[in-house]
Amino acid sequence: MPLTKYKAAAVTSEPAWFNLEAGVQKTIDFINEAGQAGCKLIAFPEVWIPGYPYWMWKINYQQSLPMLKKYRENSMAVDSDEFRRIRRAARDNQIHVSLGFSEIDHATLYLAQALISPTGEVLNHRRKIKPTHVEKLVYGDGAGDTFTSVVPTELGRLGQLNCWENMNPFLKALNVSAGEQIHIAAWPVYPGKETLKYPDPATNVADPASDLVTPAYAIETGTWTLAPFQRLSAEGLKMNTPEGVEPETDPTTYNGHARIYRPDGSLVVKPDKDFDGLLFVDIDLNECHLTKALADFSGHYMRPDLIRLLVDTRRKELVTEAEGNDGVKAYSTRERLGLNLPLDGSKEDEKVPVAL
């Protein structure tokens, strides 16, 4: 039986820009802080390590190259010692960790999320299915075996999505069908509505993400919804500006966008513009009952005989091996990267259950 009442935290802080080691240490520090505060769950923003490359929205290709090279050099592999250190921190603090990071696998980057258990096991490893707009210049697409979001945990059925995935009706439908109870709506860093210039739509600023998309997700799915957000400082603005370009000097518009919402879409907490740290919430899963009694889109309030969603969770490799009966060999990113193995052991020690 899952816990029904527990404390959770959402991170709203500035990443360690372009610095993998500093990012890992800052992540561990926050995990320690949340653990000491009695939290059972901590949620980090989208690509928290090594920070969201917002510069790609503001500069041209030639200007981006030095920053892109450094960004790739400081992205994190899941079979790395850095990732194992974060898993150990989760184990040491007996806490679930929802981590967003720029994952490097072979020569491609992915907008990745991992859900780490209090024993250090990787309960889920997913990749954003489609990078947004100019993000395609930095990241690749997730595959069939890396986009599932919701997994059963001792805290309830917990799901994760990145940025505009949280307003994708098909991904929301998939999460609802899994009976999601707690949702991590991980967001990057981007500016507020003060920066809007016609004809750029309000879709492209932080305020609708915080105050429209995220509470809509909560009320439509009937889930506790944590929305961690990155922040920026004046120094961070300089670090995210290429040489020869005048940096912005006021980071205020980038800050104060993290939120936590109840299953009925009502606001629990939002930070001041100058707040950097953890937002806390006392979760009671039983609050999901009445919202889902009114509208459960995976049960009594849906018509699967009329509307259904086709999902393909198979991975398609560029090169595949033939098997008997004219079939092809099945591939698993999870197994290839060793995420099915225990944190400090070998294949002979034990097998970690594959996330559903």
UniProtKB/Swiss-Prot annotation:
Keywords: Hydrolase, Lyase. PROSITE patterns: CN_HYDROLASE (PS50263), NITRIL_CHT_1 (PS00920), NITRIL_CHT_2 (PS00921). Its EC number is 4.2.1.66. It catalyses: formamide = hydrogen cyanide + H2O. InterPro entries: C-N_Hydrolase (IPR003010), C-N_Hydrolase_sf (IPR036526), CN_hydrolase (IPR037544), Nitrilase/CN_hydratase_CS (IPR000132), Nitrilases_CHs (IPR044149). Induction: By cyanide and propionitrile. It comes from the Eukaryota. GO terms for biological process: cyanide catabolic process. Belongs to the carbon-nitrogen hydrolase superfamily. Nitrilase family. Catalyzes the hydration of cyanide to formamide. Degradation of cyanide may be important for plant pathogenic fungi in infection of cyanogenic plants. This is Cyanide hydratase.
